[in-house]
Amino acid sequence: MNKFGKYFIFLGIILVIFSFSLLIYNNLKDYQAGKSSKEVLKIIEEDDKQINENIITNVNNLTNKEEKVININNNNYIGTIEIPSLNLKLPIMSDFTYDKLNISPCRYFGSIETKDLVICGHAYRTHFKYLANLEQGDLVIITDFYNNTYIYEVLEIEILKPTDIEEMLSGEFDLTLYTCTSDSKNRITVRCNLISE
């Protein structure tokens, strides 16, 4: 075997190892995100004492309205999101950072009250990976910490570029959910309107 053949075999082995390592890393991050969300949900759903000790009233900087926020592990949550057709229930963080997305979906913009809530989440299996499987008419349920339940209906699903921030935030939709496509080049965007509160 010549020098180039050995070089390409070595390069191929390195690429296989790198790909396998990346797969393990991504699956580990997905697992950790799912575990973190489940722990927070358990506290929210089962531990009333801890919740009552951690409830604070926060003024939403986007709306200047008061909202009930629960602080768990130094992160503020505004409620939960449930998508029955995906068998998914997750806590919602009150604000967005990339680090917080590793724990749960985050409010990116707006509020329930102003009917312009935008929630983003990673495309982890345990978070928003399957948003593209939603269909028109599917339900999305958000519950806040005043125990108000808001039921939304999926109206449309669209694909936006990551730079289409203005389009993401515009429109006459009461709720928008979004996550990355599997290749991370675009955003799966689910538009919903409130049908019951």
Model-derived features: positions:
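Short, Lys/Arg-rich N-terminal segment immediately upstream of the first membrane anchor
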Residues: 1-5
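Solvent-exposed, non-transmembrane regions of membrane-associated and secreted proteins
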Residues: 6-197
